[in-house]
Amino acid sequence: MALVTVQRSPTPSTTSSPCASEADSGEEECRSQPRSISESFLTVKGAALFLPRGNGSSTPRISHRRNKHAGDLQQHLQAMFILLRPEDNIRLAVRLESTYQNRTRYMVVVSTNGRQDTEESIVLGMDFSSNDSSTCTMGLVLPLWSDTLIHLDGDGGFSVSTDNRVHIFKPVSVQAMWSALQSLHKACEVARAHNYYPGSLFLTWVSYYESHINSDQSSVNEWNAMQDVQSHRPDSPALFTDIPTERERTERLIKTKLREIMMQKDLENITSKEIRTELEMQMVCNLREFKEFIDNEMIVILGQMDSPTQIFEHVFLGSEWNASNLEDLQNRGVRYILNVTREIDNFFPGVFEYHNIRVYDEEATDLLAYWNDTYKFISKAKKHGSKCLVHCKMGVSRSASTVIAYAMKEYGWNLDRAYDYVKERRTVTKPNPSFMRQLEEYQGILLASKQRHNKLWRSHSDSDLSDHHEPICKPGLELNKKDITTSADQIAEVKTMESHPPIPPVFVEHMVPQDANQKGLCTKERMICLEFTSREFHAGQIEDELNLNDINGCSSGCCLNESKFPLDNCHASKALIQPGHVPEMANKFPDLTVEDLETDALKADMNVHLLPMEELTSPLKDPPMSPDPESPSPQPSCQTEISDFSTDRIDFFSALEKFVELSQETRSRSFSHSRMEELGGGRNESCRLSVVEVAPSKVTADDQRSSSLSNTPHASEESSMDEEQSKAISELVSPDIFMQSHSENAISVKEIVTEIESISQGVGQIQLKGDILPNPCHTPKKNSIHELLLERAQTPENKPGHMEQDEDSCTAQPELAKDSGMCNPEGCLTTHSSIADLEEGEPAEGEQELQGSGMHPGAKWYPGSVRRATLEFEERLRQEQEHHGAAPTCTSLSTRKNSKNDSSVADLAPKGKSDEAPPEHSFVLKEPEMSKGKGKYSGSEAGSLSHSEQNATVPAPRVLEFDHLPDPQEGPGSDTGTQQEGVLKDLRTVIPYQESETQAVPLPLPKRVEIIEYTHIVTSPNHTGPGSEIATSEKSGEQGLRKVNMEKSVTVLCTLDENLNRTLDPNQVSLHPQVLPLPHSSSPEHNRPTDHPTSILSSPEDRGSSLSTALETAAPFVSHTTHLLSASLDYLHPQTMVHLEGFTEQSSTTDEPSAEQVSWEESQESPLSSGSEVPYKDSQLSSADLSLISKLGDNTGELQEKMDPLPVACRLPHSSSSENIKSLSHSPGVVKERAKEIESRVVFQAGLTKPSQMRRSASLAKLGYLDLCKDCLPEREPASCESPHLKLLQPFLRTDSGMHAMEDQESLENPGAPHNPEPTKSFVEQLTTTECIVQSKPVERPLVQYAKEFGSSQQYLLPRAGLELTSSEGGLPVLQTQGLQCACPAPGLAVAPRQQHGRTHPLRRLKKANDKKRTTNPFYNTM
């Protein structure tokens, strides 16, 4: 079927009546203005059907060249118009059979507007000689009066009788006959309706044509042939003589066979006589006496085929004729037409929206390749409330196959169900054998896609189309019933339904106020369950487990009872509400956590929900209110339980030892972080449960904040998404909170394991682990990571209401300062845990689930399932890591996490998706908030703080980084670590608070975040003593944060992408930088970022300056936060990728931030580095430093000494430049070499990771995993140095360096924090070590936790660094310089790209950056 356009030059008609008007719109104006008129016809072989202009503008502007599908029909139409009056138009032209081979005959239905403005029609017989297609003669004029009758003759023809005249017409094909009958019946109906009788005033214009009959006599005789004249067709063959005895039985058989034949034959090239002959051949009998019955049945079948079949409410399946029936299409509400043919044109391009799949109905046709596009097109129609017509030629094979494929994907049906459904509604449906095979293949693809939860078949622009693939707990996100079709989807729906009410609680983070000694722990206790597992991601295992949990109703109680991942499946609110269940949840949550983490990682976009910082703030506040870890102000029992969990931390440490052995065994993995993430997947999940440890009331408050944020107008849409995620969080959090202490332990274990692995691979690792074991703070750090995850989940909720967030931030700013210690650490822990979970989920679904379970037990490390699971997971991880290498494992974790986030992260940067950018912004905002809170922190600290907020774990890493930071600057002096101890503790308390908030946004910091301890007990930047510490801590914290930011930025951004995508949009982010730190809005911490939002709104440069200023002034915290936010926003908005790079560089610059690097960072720190660094250090000192310093005071010296050897030369600069962020590339020398080893593994494993992860998340995941492993660091660092992006990243790396610098500045600016920043540097290095466990210089705090925290910080920092980069382009050169000075920034850079590019690009960038920086960022280099 083709669309042809015919030019007609109106020639004045001598007999045209003045009152006659043109039939088709546009004719009159054409007549009044003598110019060529174009008429459009829908043509098939032997027939042309006039296409009315849709609304004047629909006339297709098609060139008048010959249409290859129209044959000579176009020329014939052109000639016919010469005989017509200008006011008349051709409604139909049908080619008829002719007795003479050299003659072509057409039956033409001509219409015009009559005297009463009614349509009057006549039939003209046109003759063409075979040798001249341009000359036409008229041989017949037959007016259609009201008494016109039409009869089928049974031989493929029909007779028209009117006014005692009978004429026989035999179209050349069934299709042509069908077209002729349609037009004739329509004309006859009009004649009957208006009573056109002979002799009336109607059809007076017939005389014009009667006077123009000019065909030769033979042609006129043929037109006037009598009814009794036999057809020239021969009789049926006399082969079959016996007539069926049972006529009815024969007729039934004829109906069946006739339909089959008509479905198989091209009706344009076959006559009813030939169809009858075919029937006779098949039935082996003569059907001559059934010919009338056959013709009538044929018309019935044609009628059925000619009307589109409504398959779904928004989908019609039809033929080319349906596509050409404008009136019918408009009456049915069709606005979209999917044309699955190569031979049929779009008939009304100006009226309908077309999508063309240009293929033939052949077995060689690859229709499968187009089904993703067709799915999007149909979904687009549905989204806009319109109907879509899917048509091919007959609506039998090509279009039917396309609709079946759509049903399979849209509703999650298998092929049999979809085929039966479509066949039931359109019985002629019959895909050709090749299409059926392709449908079977598509079924497998959809199943696999569902299982690995990737976005292979889901476009980002139309992600809402395949809602069933979205995380089960996506309260705010649209959870379509279709999505729920799959078991995973159903579970998701259940979760959503169950979790929706608890959304506010979801983000609840119970932070059990602990003694001054346990302040860090309090922070850790406030773990945010950020992971919303996309049920579909783990279509198989996770889906089943999750489904079971969801089906259970998996409320907090369910989660508590189940040792799977109830948090993900349970309602956080319930869990939060039920403090008593918290411990149980913690115990059983780990198993679920791992799976959940996997699911979350896979469904990062939808799954990860940033929990509002407000919630984080509440828990933080609570700890300050109740210093005793066992006396949570809101829920003592819960806190007590948390306390118990803290006690259990020792068990975790023993588990840590086990993990150390494992890590040693799987040192080849050289991805301690990767391993930790896998092992810590369970731990991270435990950490998620750790949120439970947070005071229940605090959790409730946080959840309430989350819900309030979600309810805000801005949050309305995003809020819904956030809510869904919050639900997931809710489910996660309630168990999380119950398990918070437990989770902390789990996080500690994970952290420990990670560090131990790193230690196995490097010197600093073991020491770090040792510190962690003695220092319960580390456990809280891990919890912090999880909290950050939870917070991050909250953040998306908050993001919906940017304004609210900003306000909350402002209001919560003071609180942030106050509760920084508690909230931040908790947030950090949660984030890290979540990140770890996400990353863990990424390595391998099955493996991850197993690991998750094992990790969780590990996280519990208590007698029981957790411990056993830990052992099992250790074994599995060991085997898997040995098999794939630690780096690969981490890569797969990151990759999986990115699979959903991937699009968010990678796409977010390019797309400017709100999700990813907002997470970064949020992260950055939080950093500035932390800065504000810590007023004393240097720019570096501000960055750290921001990261802290984002991942509670980040603070601990920052603390480590802080210690390390000074080391690079001042050397690995043990006293720096010791000195930091006290200060760092305080700072950490404050920083983690902000960091938790910040981290909440960048949930993706899986393992790193865990490292952050709840040292953020120094909640108030107002603290005088802690204040100075905070300043120092902020610096060191910022470095740690940077590191964490790097990894976390990648991971978190990914997760946030999902969450933020739902809740925050790039425009919103840029418009409302405050929104970025949704966590702020969510929790009191969010209030603090509010100050930053203002700054954030300011130019990125301002932000950098502000950060610098913030470090200098008591308000630095606020200014830093603001600037960070600004930078973050800028970073996200301008180019998530580039900014990510920047962040990555800064974050991952953990190589050698030596004194020069530190100074360089300092120099760059004010514009770019400052903001980023401040949060980093802040967070570090605040959460990890405070706790660790107090608990690891003695250990700090040892750890520093142990870590100094490695980090001092290599690690120190490493830490200094972007210690935490650089956890990706931990030790400069050893780490580099190890990174190289891991690099191959990570690359390999990345290749083995989920496809979606591989696509975008692969690189990010790889980077993230690499960050974790110090073995990979050396390798990656060189690569990073080489990375061209290094320069871009270097500014961010510089941020890490800047952190050191900021520490120095902070020391200068904030005497209160004399050299805490330096200890932070050490810690940064430690974090680096944690990531690369080998390079943990100051072991004041558990290196493992710091490492994890660092990882979180890195990832988190990355986004922030990116923001900074965006903020002040001028800082870019500085970053480059930093990169030159320290290789570390390069890794950070890589991390940032990781966020941007879905983890693959980041590695490359990191590589370049590392090469440039010559730091130990092997992880990034690996990619």
UniProtKB/Swiss-Prot annotation:
It is found in: Cytoplasm; Cytoplasm, Cytoskeleton; Cell junction, Focal adhesion; Cytoplasmic vesicle, Secretory vesicle, Acrosome. It holds the Pfam family PH_SSH1-like_1st. Residues 1-37, 617-641, 664-684, 696-728, 797-825, 840-862, 877-954, 962-981, 1019-1041, 1070-1108, 1144-1179 are annotated as: Disordered. InterPro entries: DEK_C, Dual-sp_phosphatase_cat-dom, Phosphatase_SSH-like, Prot-tyrosine_phosphatase-like, SSH-N, Tyr_Pase_AS, Tyr_Pase_dom, TYR_PHOSPHATASE_DUAL_dom. Residues 621-635 have a biased composition (Pro residues). The keyword Hydrolase applies. Residues 9-18 have a biased composition (Low complexity). Interacts with filamentous actin. Tyrosine phosphatase activity has not been demonstrated for this protein to date. This is Protein phosphatase Slingshot homolog 2.
